[in-house]
Every structure is written in C-alpha cells, then in structure tokens.
C-alpha cells in the first residue's frame, strides 16, 4: 500500500512539473500571433517550405528546427524582458538555416557545412527576401563560436543561444525519448 501511495505521489509530482513547464514555456498571445504571421509571410514570399524536405538534427527537419529557434528566441526575449525588435528576431531566426539543401547527403559541396552554411543561408535569404541589417547579422553570425566572428546585435546573440539550445534538445531527443518541443 505504501509503495502504491509513493508511486501515486511521484506521478502527481511529475504531472504538476510537466504542467508547470508547459505553462512557463508559453508565449503571450501577441508573440504567438507575430510568429504565425511571420511564418505565413515568409512562406508566401520565398521557399521556406523547402526546409521541410531535409533533416537538421536527429529526427527534426530544418523547418521544424527553425520554428523551434524562433519560438525559443521569442520566449527568451519575453522571459528575460530584453528589449529587442521582435519582427527582426523572428525573421532572422526563421531564416538562420535557409541553406536549402540536405547536408547529410554525401556531396563534396557539403563538406565543412558548419562553417559554410551561414553564408549560403544569407545568400539565399537575400535573394528571396528584403532583409534589414539585424536579420542579416542573425543569419551570418548564428554559428558563433564555431565561426569566430561574434554577433553584433542583441537579436543575433539571442538567436545564437536559442539555436544551440534547440540543437542540443533535438539531437538528444531520440536518445532519451524525451520530447523537446511539441
């Protein structure tokens, strides 16, 4: 009987913690709207949907990874109460890996992908969209410190951090069967 009570208490605690985590990782309605509108705009103007065709980390597509980074960046901005340009933050986050190829395929052009893809992503994004300076900086500098030139604006620093956090979660997810994002 005692073991059953302990097990029930443990399950209740886990459920409370999951609910608390879900609530604490939610965006305000306004930020959710901004994210949805920006995704819609980028899909209409360019080739954002092509990111669905290739995987990024583990079982996560490049598209899903970009959404995760954009969401996490907005969450960090809200949670830490950092003054940023939310639209630039979201656009830069959604386009930071806009390189439009499957880097897992055996192809000599994909060698040193980690070092080269920010430049490719920036070139593709500039061809398909009108970018401001912050959005360009986000895309070009998100691989710091692998690429030793640091971000130059707060938005780029936040996306750089969010990218590392999401990449870790997405890579570890299949190993531990833990859902990083819904």
Which residue ranges define each predicted feature?
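Metal-dependent phosphohydrolase cores
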Residues: 1-182
């Amino acid at each position: 009987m005692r073991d059953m009570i302990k097990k029930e208490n443990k399950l209740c605690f886990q459920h409370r913690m999951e609910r608390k985590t879900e609530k604490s990782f939610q965006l305000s309605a306004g930020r959710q709207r901004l994210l949805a509108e920006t995704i819609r705009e980028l899909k209409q103007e360019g080739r954002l949907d092509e990111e669905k065709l290739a995987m990024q980390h583990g079982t996560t597509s490049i598209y899903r990874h970009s959404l995760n980074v954009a969401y996490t960046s907005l969450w960090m901005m809200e949670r830490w109460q950092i003054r940023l340009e939310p639209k630039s933050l979201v656009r830069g986050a959604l386009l930071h890996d806009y390189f439009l190829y499957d880097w897992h395929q055996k192809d000599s052009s994909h060698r040193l992908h980690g070092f080269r893809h920010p430049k490719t992503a920036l070139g593709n994004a500039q061809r398909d969209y009108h970018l401001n300076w912050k959005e360009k900086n986000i895309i070009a500098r998100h691989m710091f410190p692998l690429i030793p030139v640091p971000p130059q604006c707060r938005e780029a620093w936040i996306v750089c951090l969010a990218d590392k956090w999401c990449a870790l979660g997405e890579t570890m997810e299949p190993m531990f069967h833990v859902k990083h994002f819904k």
